[in-house]
Amino acid sequence: APMENSTYDYTNYDSLGTLDPSTPVDNTVRRLRPTTIVALVIYMAVFLVGVPGNALVVWVTALEAKRTVNAIWFLNLAVADLLSCLALPILFVSIIQEGHWPFGRAACSVLPSLILLNMYASILLLATISADRFLLVFNPIWCQNTRGAGLAWLACCVAWGLALLLTIPSFLYRKVLQDDYPPKTTCGVDYGHEGVRAERAVAIVRLVVGFLLPLFTLSVCYTFLLLRTWSRNGTRSTKTLKVVVAVVVSFFIFWLPYQVMGMILALLHPSSATFRWAIRLDPLCIALAYVNCCINPIIYVVAGKGFQGQLRKSLPSLLRNVLAEESVIQGSKSFSRSTVDTVADKCQAV
């Protein structure tokens, strides 16, 4: 079996091109591939947009999180994205240095794994938010009696705990490795005696738990939600529903290439032409997955401008409007919110 002791992992940021047979084995300078250069440009854009954007969302939602369920959801999503964005400069430096990793073993285990933690945390949080939307529409009595900030924080803690458990393989298998040709220290994935079997198992679990299962369940959930919304057109606000749907769709769009490439690299033999082709495209797929870390603030701003009908709102005010709980119009009677914990907000906002 190929790569029995040290196998390629498609989250291995330091291995961009090092498995290519054309890689020089002496000390000659090798130029970065075009796909890697494009990936680096994307990383820069993600960092420049994602750090201030998510930090602003964290600031706005943290002020409302004690009393607003929606703010709790969006706060946790922003924290997950912000953690991944903050790790980008170190990963960027490693790629520029052709995979050299001078940051030590602990950083090797943690920093490249943050994108996987982000993936699992984001999809589990989105599933939790979707369940909240579903219950608000189909079980309003339960919401009136039970829904609150305490339960929302508990659900988020469970989501983060599960995400950490699912990221454990990446933490455990990542090690600092010594390359001989050319001599350098790299941060790689070593499956040891388990070899290809472990690599394939990790990739399959990642695909099923992190993509296919959520795609199916959320598709069913939002099909019912949208059908109910359309059948009662004009009876309730759909602001939050539209924002959440946009966030969910963007997640699956930007993570799809990563998941497809991961399965190709896990299942095919390294000597195959398709594998070598996948190695070249892999940096771009990883970069696209990182785009998901900066896209949510953009969605919130675009949605806020659409809902406000004006462009003069300050960003904090605009975000606060988009991410707050909603007032409800039911029939001809308007229920205005004095706080986000009113019965109308709890049981009718979609």
From Swiss-Prot:
Membrane topology: Multi-pass membrane protein
Glycan attachment sites: 5
Post-translational modification: Sulfation plays a critical role in the association of C5aR with C5a, but no significant role in the ability of the receptor to transduce a signal and mobilize calcium in response to a small peptide agonist.
Gene Ontology CC terms: apical part of cell; basolateral plasma membrane; cytoplasmic vesicle
Location within or outside the cell: Cell membrane; Cytoplasmic vesicle
Classification via InterPro entries: Anphylx_rcpt_C3a/C5a1-2, Formyl_rcpt-rel, GPCR_Rhodpsn, GPCR_Rhodpsn_7TM
GO BP annotations, alphabetical order: chemotaxis; inflammatory response; mRNA transcription by RNA polymerase II; phospholipase C-activating G protein-coupled receptor signaling pathway; positive regulation of cytosolic calcium ion concentration; positive regulation of epithelial cell proliferation; positive regulation of ERK1 and ERK2 cascade
MF (Gene Ontology): complement component C5a receptor activity; G protein-coupled receptor activity
Disulfide partners: 108-187
Positions of post-translational Sulfotyrosine modification: 10, 13
Positions in the Extracellular compartment: 1-36, 93-109, 174-200, 266-282
Cytoplasmic side: 64-68, 132-152, 227-242, 304-350
Chain positions found as Phosphoserine: 314, 317, 327, 332, 334, 338
TM ranges: 37-63, 69-92, 110-131, 153-173, 201-226, 243-265, 283-303
UniProt cross-references to SUPFAM superfamilies, sorted A to Z: Family A G protein-coupled receptor-like
UniProt keyword terms in alphabetical order: Cell membrane, Chemotaxis, Cytoplasmic vesicle, Disulfide bond, G-protein coupled receptor, Glycoprotein, Membrane, Phosphoprotein, Receptor, Sulfation, Transducer, Transmembrane, Transmembrane helix
Primary subcellular site in the record, as a coarse category: membrane
Coiled coil residues, start to end: none
Entry function: Receptor for the chemotactic and inflammatory peptide anaphylatoxin C5a. The ligand interacts with at least two sites on the receptor: a high-affinity site on the extracellular N-terminus, and a second site in the transmembrane region which activates downstream signaling events. Receptor activation stimulates chemotaxis, granule enzyme release, intracellular calcium release and superoxide anion production.
Similarity comment: Belongs to the G-protein coupled receptor 1 family.
Subunit structure: Homodimer. May also form higher-order oligomers. Interacts (when phosphorylated) with ARRB1 and ARRB2; the interaction is associated with internalization of C5aR.
Name of the protein this chain belongs to: C5a anaphylatoxin chemotactic receptor 1
Species of provenance: Oryctolagus cuniculus
